[in-house]
Structure formats: structure tokens, C-alpha cells
Curated annotation (Swiss-Prot):
Acidic residues bias (residue ranges): 219-228
Residues annotated with Phosphoserine modification: 189, 354
Name of the encoding gene: Nol4l
TM stretches of this protein: none
PANTHER family the UniProt entry points to: DEATH DOMAIN-CONTAINING PROTEIN, NUCLEOLAR PROTEIN 4
Low complexity bias: start-end ranges: 100-120, 443-454
Stretches for region Disordered: 1-24, 43-243, 410-459
Polar residues: bias regions: 43-55, 410-425
InterPro entries tied to this protein: HTH_NOL4, NOL4/NOL4L
Pfam family of the protein (one): HTH_NOL4_2nd
Coiled coil (UniProt feature): none
Lineage, broadest ranks: Eukaryota, Metazoa, Chordata, Craniata, Vertebrata
Protein name: Nucleolar protein 4-like
Length: 494
């Protein structure tokens, strides 16, 4: 603490003026010893005769207060030692102990800028200028002279700035204490703009600032590549759940993602309707894992991008620790159930669309159309028995074999449409349009064709049939992929 001969001295029971901040060294620790020394210094200076005060006493006391050392009595003058031994000072020392410990000492008022600014209306304090006259004080203090709130960190170069210490009148203890409590010029985090309790508590505790608290969440965390392992759904997260069903659920998601999504695109950029369809399928087949379906999709897409980045093969089989015979059975049952439900939903859609736009047909012709529709629905059942189509020896599938599937279905269609005995019903695709054409008239039905108009499908029905065909193809490709993985599993086990 730097006391100079020209600086004013505050009274005992009054808060210091704004100019006192130029005297107080805020680098000193705020301890009871520091408060006692400060108050003793004020009381001793008031008891001294103004005519006997010299600049030597202030220079000597400067080094004594700055050192913050227990050897205070050795640096005091003999007259000051006698005053400290007097009963009055001993009594005031005890009062200082109690006041500083209870946190209501006068030294604490220097920490609050609002209390220090309230002294501007008080009478002027006496000035130690040797003539005993009380001169008015200048209250026009600059921003650097204002008291500083110690609860907030000061940015480097502001308020305190770089400390400059006088070289005269300072001992080794004083220099040591200045080095210890010097201002840090290292860049720190900016001070909080609001003096809230949380910010003060964070600063006082000295803990590193948590930059994640209070920050607005990212727009979508699906694109970050965290350290999630490829298929590492922790088993401890699924306590009370069947681990075999968890494995089947993981493979179920993998198959759906492989068939419907681009594995190099993050989930946030995938088509929303496809993501929602996969989540709904997972909810139907694995209701206990419906909450983690989206996370499972995101994790698998991340692993695919990571493996592509590392140059690994994407058409790899399922890792052995993530599958088992029971899990494969559960997966096959789930796939079959999902296929049946998808076909049922599409049939209902077609039925509803046909009810909305009825076509005036004869009963015989409506029975023929119904038989044709049922023969179309038998496509997946026939596709199950077909040999999988391999491309370049890999596990990929193609749709090139579906033309033969339609020709194989022609005998069954002709059996169900018994009236057309002269030839099979034509179910071939014309011009790339995936819609079945009306039956080809035969000589035996020419008379019927002349009297009855040819059935024409409405655009709504055509769209519904196309959706049905696309669903069948996806189901067939899905089952082909499942068969390939099962075959690879058998080869790995043997």
C-alpha cells in the first residue's frame, strides 16, 4: 500500500474517498492482517501531531505496509510502538479483530464502488501538508482512480495496468510480495457484462470457464463426427432388454439404410420422408427401441462416411459380434412382417382410390380385374424363390431379373382368370411405364369387347399401382440383401 505525504487520510468510521484507490494496492490479498494494518495506519496517523509528521515516516511506513510481513513492529518508529502498546490501542485492536472476522470492517467498504462514491457529499478530509490547515479536496478523479470491483476480472491494460513500483524505500520482503501478487498480463477470458451471481461465483472460485453452458445449441449435431463406434450400441444402455433383439434391430436399421438412403450423406441432408418411414418401420417391428431409431440411423451413416474416408470396403459383412443365429431369425421375421404390412397398406390405398373413382364395368370384367390384381400381389412370393442376381461377384443386387418374374407369373394369372383360356394375360410393362395393361382381347371375347367399353385406369390408380410396384421392388431387394448376409454368415461360421 503506497502512502505518500500528499495523500489525504480518511477518518476512522467513514468510508474512503475515490482518491484512496490511488493509495490502496489491490494486488494485496484481502486478509484480516491487511485490514488491521490498514486501520492501525489510519488511527496512528490521526493521533500523530500534524507538525511532527515528516516525509521520512511515510517513506519508512511505505515499505512496511507493502511487505505484508508479520514483522510490523520492527519497522515502526519508537513513538508508534508506544502507542501500539497502550491499552487504548490494544482495545481497538481487539475490536478490529472482531469487525474484520464478521465481514463488517471498514476495509470491506473499499471493495464496493457504490459506497465509496457516497462520500462525495461529506466534509473535506484533513490534508497532511504540515501547516495544519484543512484544504478542500479535489473529487474530480479519473477512471483510473475509481475503486475497482474485485469480484470481476480486469482485462490486461485497463484500470490497474502494468504495475510500476518505486525503487526507494522498499526492502526484499516488499519486492517478494509484489512479485507474488503482481498483475497477470496473460490474456484471459473477457469479463462478464452482467454482475450476476453465477458469473461472480465462477470468477471467484478460480475454475476454468465452461464454454458449453448457456451457449445456444448447434443447428443440427447430426453432422459432427463424434467418436461413436460403427455399431457400438452399449449393452449397458439396454438393461432389461433382449440383446438378441438389439442385434436384430441394428441389422434391421442397416438394411433399411442400405436400401433407401445414400450412406455418404448425413442424416440432416437425407430426405425427411425416407427417414421417417424407416423410423416408423423400426417402431412397428421393434417398439422397445423406437426412441433410439434415429440415433441408430445417424450412427450408421457416420460410420459409413468414416469408413469411406479411411478407404475401407463398404460392402463388408456384418461383424460377427453384432449378429447371431437367433438375431438373424428375428430379423427375417421382422422383414417378412414389414413386407406383409407394406403390401396390405398399398392394397388399402388402391382400394380407397378405386372407391373414390368407381369404373362402370360388368361383373365378369370386374372379376377378371380382381384376379389380375391378386396375381400382381403374388409378385413378392415368387420373388422370394428366385436366385439372387450378383453383379461383379459382389453382394449388390439389380432389378434386371424382374422382367422374367413377370413372365413367370403369366401361367398363374391365366389360371386365376379362367375366362381367357386361349392365352395368358399380358402383364408386360410397355414403354417403361410400370402399370399393368388391361387384358388383351381374344377371339372368344371379341363379342364382349364390342358391347363393353375397355377399362381405363385413372391417373390416381396408375400412381397407386406404381407405388405398389416400387414397394415390391424395394421389398424384393431388401430380402435379397438379407439372403446375401445370411449366406455370408454361414460361410463365416464354416
Amino acid at each position: 500500500m503506497h502512502f505518500n505525504s500528499s495523500g489525504p487520510e480518511p477518518k476512522e468510521n467513514e468510508p474512503p474517498s475515490p482518491l484512496v484507490s490511488g493509495i490502496i494496492d489491490y494486488n494485496m490479498p484481502l486478509t484480516s492482517t491487511y485490514l488491521k494494518q490498514m486501520k492501525l495506519r489510519v488511527m496512528n496517523s490521526q493521533e500523530q501531531d500534524e507538525t511532527s509528521v515528516s516525509s521520512e515516516d511515510f517513506d519508512m511506513n511505505d515499505s512496511a505496509w507493502m511487505s505484508a510481513d508479520p514483522h510490523l513492529a520492527s519497522s515502526l518508529s519508537p513513538s508508534q510502538e508506544e502507542r501500539m502498546r497502550s491499552p487504548q490501542n490494544l482495545h481497538s485492536q481487539e475490536d478490529d479483530d472482531s469487525s474484520s472476522e464478521s465481514g463488517s470492517g471498514n476495509g470491506s467498504s473499499t471493495l464496493n464502488p457504490s459506497t465509496s462514491s457516497s462520500t462525495q457529499g461529506d466534509p473535506a478530509f484533513p490534508e497532511m501538508n504540515g501547516n495544519g490547515a484543512a484544504a478542500p479536496m479535489d473529487f474530480t478523479a479519473t477512471a483510473e482512480d475509481q475503486p475497482i470491483n474485485l469480484c470481476e476480472k480486469l482485462p490486461p491494460g485497463t484500470a490497474l495496468g502494468t504495475p510500476s513500483y518505486p525503487s526507494d524505500g522498499c526492502g526484499t520482503d516488499g519486492l517478494r510480495s509484489r512479485v507474488k501478487y503482481g498483475v497477470k498480463n496473460t490474456p484471459e477470458s473477457p469479463p462478464y457484462s452482467s454482475g450476476s451471481y453465477d458469473s461472480i461465483k465462477t470468477e471467484v472460485s478460480g475454475c476454468p470457464e465452461d464454454l458449453t453452458v448457456g451457449r445456444a445449441p448447434a443447428a443440427d449435431d447430426d453432422d459432427d463426427d463424434h467418436d461413436d463406434h460403427e455399431d457400438n450400441d452399449k449393452m449397458n444402455d439396454s438393461e432389461g432388454m433382449d440383446p438378441e433383439r438389439l442385434k436384430a434391430f441394428n441389422m434391421f436399421v442397416r438394411l433399411f439404410v442400405d436400401e433407401n438412403l445414400d450412406r455418404m450423406v448425413p442424416i440432416s441432408k437425407q430426405p425427411k420422408e425416407k427417414i421417417q418411414a424407416i423410423i416408423e418401420s423400426c417402431s412397428r417391428q421393434f417398439p422397445e427401441f423406437q426412441e433410439r431409431a434415429r440415433k441408430r440411423i445417424r450412427t450408421y451413416l457416420k460410420s459409413c462416411r468414416r469408413m469411406k474416408k479411411n478407404g475401407m470396403e463398404m460392402t463388408r459383412p456384418t461383424p460377427p459380434h453384432l449378429t447371431s443365429a437367433m438375431a438373424e431369425n428375428i430379423l427375417a421375421a421382422a422383414c417378412e412382417s414389414e413386407t406383409r404390412k407394406a403390401a396390405k397398406r398399398m392394397r388399402l390405398e388402391i382400394y380407397q382410390s378405386s372407391q373414390e373413382e368407381p369404373i362402370a364395368l360388368d361383373k365378369q370384367h370386374s372379376r377378371d380385374s380382381t384376379a389380375i390384381t391378386h396375381s400382381t400381389y403374388s409378385l413378392p412370393a415368387s420373388a422370394y424363390s428366385q436366385d439372387p442376381v450378383y453383379v461383379n461377384g459382389g453382394l449388390n443386387y439389380s432389378y434386371r431379373g424382374y422382367g422374367s418374374l413377370s413372365s413367370n407369373l403369366q401361367p398363374s394369372a391365366s389360371l386365376q382368370t379362367g375366362n381367357h383360356s386361349n392365352g395368358p394375360t399380358d402383364l408386360s410393362m410397355k414403354g417403361g411405364a410400370s402399370t399393368p395393361t388391361p387384358p388383351t382381347p381374344t377371339p372368344s371375347s371379341n363379342s364382349t369387347s364390342r358391347t363393353m367399353p375397355t377399362a381405363q385406369l385413372s391417373p390416381t390408380e396408375i400412381s397407386a399401382v406404381r407405388q405398389l410396384i416400387a414397394g415390391y421392388r424395394e421389398s424384393a431387394a431388401f430380402l435379397l440383401r438379407s439372403a446375401d448376409e445370411l449366406e455370408n454368415l454361414i460361410l463365416q461360421q464354416n
